[in-house]
Regions:
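Anionic group-transfer/hydrolysis microenvironments
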Residues: 8, 88, 122-123, 132, ...
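Short acidic/polar capping segments at secondary-structure boundaries
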Residues: 30, 59-62, 88-92, 103-104, ...
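ATP-grasp fold ATP-binding core
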Residues: 44, 71-94, 114-126, 142
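Phosphate-binding site of ATP-dependent enzymes
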Residues: 97-187
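C-terminal active-site "lid" helix and adjoining low-complexity regulatory extension at the edge
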Residues: 189-193, 202-249
Length: 249
């Protein structure tokens, strides 16, 4: 039986093959939700995913999106600062801007098509991890660790970080790692993907006094259907995709 596997592609089956009875891994509609931050965050909110408080700008005011509810009529003065503006289709941190106060945000807003952005409360948690997951669980994980000479230290991406594997002592698995995995799987399910990457941001294992935390607060940042993969990552994906195809036979 023919299988179509999408890692970021939106190409429908009929443009790939005349055969309609095919196995699909990551359907186009799931990728569409995952790649658009507004659609993705709506899916998170509807499914009670542990994620940052977020807002859109509509009809001259900000709207906060909450599970089963909206809070309307919010002006820039009442937003939780610092706040992030995020391009709905930006990747790898592109299109993201940190606004420390109302003045910064108002200056940035001038001349922008604000419907192309979402806005998130900024959580300055010390660590970020990427979990590669299926709806069964995780199969590959990395810690993003900032380079010592990184200038902008409010975000983590491939330019200012190195990637630390789970076997490395610096990985420093959080005490509530199972909760993190559970939320990442739920996030993947909420957007409809079969396989993909989920980024989380989380508190460090110790508090400011050096005491071990009993739990580490965290948020799910986003899902990704086309993550950058090393040779090792590609091998892991190949094995998991084969499993997914066999399961759907």
């Amino acid at each position: 039986k023919l299988a179509v596997v999408r890692l970021g592609s939106l190409t429908p089956v009929e443009e790939i093959t005349g055969i309609r009875d095919v196995i699909e891994i990551n359907k186009p509609e799931a990728i569409e939700i995952s790649r658009d931050k507004k659609l993705m965050k709506e899916a998170f909110t509807q499914n009670n995913i542990k994620t940052a408080n977020w807002f859109t700008y509509e009809k001259d005011c900000f709207i906060q999106h909450c599970p089963g509810n909206f809070i309307t009529g919010i002006d820039t003065e009442k937003l939780p600062y610092p706040i992030l503006s995020k391009s709905r289709t930006g990747q790898g941190g592109s299109g993201n801007t940190l606004h420390k106060d109302q003045k910064s945000l108002q200056e940035w807003m001038k001349g922008k098509t604000l419907s192309n952005y979402i806005f998130e409360e900024f959580y300055n948690y010390a660590r970020e991890y990427r979990l590669h997951v299926t709806q069964e669980g995780t199969f590959l994980v990395w810690r993003k660790m900032r380079k010592s000479d990184a200038k902008d230290r409010w975000y983590f991406n491939s330019d200012n970080c190195v990637w630390i594997g789970e076997e490395n002592p610096l990985f420093d698995k959080p005490i509530n790692w199972d909760d993190c995995i559970q939320q990442c799987v739920l996030a993947l399910k909420s957007v409809g993907l079969d396989i993909g990457a989920v980024d989380i941001r989380i508190q460090s294992s110790e508090d400011k006094d050096g005491n071990k935390r009993k739990t580490c607060d965290f948020i799910v940042l986003e899902t990704g259907s086309a993550p950058a993969l090393s040779t090792i990552g590609s091998e892991f994906y190949y094995k998991e995709i084969v499993k997914l195809i066999n399961k759907k036979l």
